[in-house]
Amino acid sequence: LKILSAVLNNIETDQRLDKVCHSLLKFGYDIELIGATINGRPKLNKPYKTFLIEQKNQSTMKKYAEFNYKLFFTLLKKADKQTILLANDLDSLLPFYLVSKIKKIPLVFDSHEIYSELPSLHNRPKTKKVWKTLERSLVPKIKYFYTVSDG
């Protein structure tokens, strides 16, 4: 089975996703991590496949919108019936969810926080409302998910 995952962070330095990808690879999955070219193209030396989405926008909301738009079409192209989609956090859940419905393939949601409660959103009510709306509309529809928490 193939697993497609994505992160808007720098995939060269994202330790959480690197651990997940290494574990999945160890258990025999064909893993591909999709990332973004936020500050140029990182030199990637990973034992699993990687793919970078060209990012033009750097402002926060435009960056998320562009990444999710391009991620949707990337997932559509790469996913098939032998694919499991692994969404990491709320910031990329929408394209994963849509592709899982279109292709009728499983989606797993990895959430390590309640995204709409991030401290960086406390003084940004409009942005917080967008994330809260996505949380309320998508998370209850996810059949498979996991989280790691101290609580």
What are these regions (language model features)?
Residues K77-Q82:
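Glycine-rich phosphate-binding loop signature in dinucleotide/nucleotide-binding domains
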Residues Y48-T74, N123-K126:
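A short, charged, and often flexible helix/loop element on the N-terminal side
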Residues N39-P47:
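Short loop/helix-cap segments at secondary-structure boundaries that form the rim of catalytic
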Residues D14, I84-K104, V108-E117:
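An aromatic- and histidine-rich active-site surface loop
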Residues T83-I84, K143:
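Conserved acidic residues
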Residues L1-G40, Y144:
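N-terminal subdomain of nucleotide-sugar transferases
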Residues F72-L76, L94, L98-I102, F109, ...:
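Membrane-proximal helix-turn-helix segments that form the acceptor-binding/catalytic region
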Residues G151:
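Carbohydrate-associated surface elements
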